[in-house]
Amino acid sequence: MVGGGWKRRPGAGAGPQCEKTVDVKKSKFCEADVSSDLRKEVENHYTLSLPEDFYHFWKFCEELDSEKPADPLSASLGLQLVDPYNILAGKHKMKKKSTVPNFNLHWRFYYDPPEFQTIIIRDKLSATWGISDRDSPDELPVYVGINEAKKNCIIVPNGDNVFAAVKLYLMKKLKEVTDKKKTNLFKNVDEKLTETARELGYSLEQRTMKMKQRDKKVVTKTFHGTGLVPPVDKNVVGYRELPETDADLKRICKTIVEAASDDERRKAFAPIQEMMTFVQFANDECDYGMGLELGMDLFCYGSHYFHKVAGQLLPLAYNLLKRNLFAEIMKDHLANRRKENIDQFAA
């Protein structure tokens, strides 16, 4: 039985985002040579702003292969640029007009929360490899993460820009590879990428100051591990803890999923229903982060048994937090959640 108490987490205040302060050869804020019309087209399709490193990395890939800039890392690293990069590549213009693509679902993998947007995949369809995370639709992404979509919901932060994410992956591959030809190929890409990133002033560290500043504002890690950052004021209004630990909530979910009958499953849902009542109380007192956490955990657990509850909790939480685009993405995702055929431009 779920305990009857719940509380706000102490010390979960929200402060301003810290800007990166590193010495660079060249300002990283210089704009990539991508036309304003093309930028607007990308942002209009997704209703999101993209960071400058997104465009700089595209120009880097164009230098590697001007004819197929989405694929120059495919042969060497198995990486392919997708989703918003498809717009830069003009792939959306090749789509048959008989069907209208849903950009909320384009390359949205099974475990991708609304805060995340796929930008790179690995080995064709095997993984959401690079995903950028923003805590609110009106903010720029804080980091690039890695998720093995066929394994679980865990997301591992890998630098605060695309160059860092690919560089760190390259370093890992260089340690694993034994073939001399591949080693030289990796080193060649690494040298070019490192030089470009340094010229533009991008950090190649796995965990930067900007990421550490976000970590301080995370109120709960959630099942995917990278945490949630709902607005929390100086009086700690905005979030209160769930009455169950992550481990206990996972056990409750496991019991529900493995129930031998519908009757047993309904009984096993009792703790979840009680927590939903707590969420209602929390929402009444502006602690919207509680419903966001419970909904996200149930979404991340992955079972279709939790889709209905997640569909009640998450869109409401996002709307209360004025993150309406995330509510829309979540509704679309839960209505069309799948593990394959996620390329909206596929024939």
Curated annotation (Swiss-Prot):
GO terms for biological process: DNA repair-dependent chromatin remodeling; double-strand break repair. Belongs to the HPF1 family. The modification N-acetylmethionine is found at M1. GO terms for molecular function: histone binding; poly-ADP-D-ribose binding. Pfam families: HPF1 (PF10228). This is Putative histone PARylation factor 1-like. It comes from Homo sapiens (Human). GO terms for cellular component: nucleus. Keywords: Acetylation. The modification N6-acetyllysine is found at K187, K234.
